[in-house]
């Protein structure tokens, strides 16, 4: 069975960040391992309207083109519906997650993701962040887990 994962925009952009910092380099390496798993069919990636929107806002044409190429590997798209907007509001209000991040999380839950991967500490390490959002996911019939790509690779690859 294929595992469904949702990659936050910052994961797709990690290869273009300053690689002199250990954490950024490790997250980039983890992303490369995940990409290989996607190409081999082990993982199915979700995309969403909020993800597409954020990618259109990438200023560098080269970076945007490369990220769009990564995104083209996605096999499943979550259409923005009222249920996603409502769930995003619940996540924002209950868990203290920023609007766009809450919409990413809501799309991942609605799309049946097993994991939501992000490099954003505000999502993974916030006082109420991951645990709260995972509880909301559970309430909506999802066992989705939220973690950094490095942790995901250590657990699942």
Predicted regions, residues:
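Acidic, PIN/NYN-like endoribonuclease modules and their adjacent C-terminal/linker elements
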Residues: 1-2, 18-25, 94, 111-157
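Short, conserved catalytic or adaptor-binding loops enriched in Gly and charged residues
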Residues: 36-39, 67-71, 134-143
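PIN/NYN-family metal-dependent endoribonuclease catalytic core
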Residues: 6-61, 72, 147-150
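Short, solvent-exposed polar/charged micro-motifs at secondary-structure junctions
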Residues: 54-59, 87-91, 155-157
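Active-site neighborhoods of divalent-metal-dependent phosphate/nucleic-acid chemistry enzymes
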Residues: 76-127
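Short acidic-hydrophobic, aromatic-tinged amphipathic segments that line or gate anion-handling sites
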Residues: 75-80, 145-149
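A short alpha-helix capping/helix-coil boundary motif
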Residues: 12-14, 45, 65-68, 82-86
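Amphipathic alpha-helical interface surfaces
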Residues: 30, 51, 63-66, 84, ...
């Amino acid at each position: 069975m294929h595992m469904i994962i949702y990659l936050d925009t910052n994961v797709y952009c990690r290869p273009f960040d300053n690689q002199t910092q250990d954490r950024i380099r490790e997250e980039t390496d983890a992303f490369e391992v995940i990409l290989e798993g996607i190409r081999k069919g082990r993982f199915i990636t979700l995309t969403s309207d909020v993800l597409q929107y954020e990618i259109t806002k990438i200023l560098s044409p080269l970076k945007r083109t490369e990220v769009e190429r990564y995104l083209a590997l996605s096999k499943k798209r979550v259409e923005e519906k009222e249920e996603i907007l409502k769930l995003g509001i619940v996540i924002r209000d209950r868990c203290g997650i920023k609007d766009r991040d809450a919409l990413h999380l809501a799309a991942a839950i609605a799309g049946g993701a097993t994991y939501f991967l992000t490099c954003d500490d505000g999502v993974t390490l916030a006082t109420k962040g991951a645990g709260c959002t995972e509880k909301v996911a559970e309430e909506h019939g999802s066992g989705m887990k939220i973690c950094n790509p490095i942790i995901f690779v250590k657990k699942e690859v």
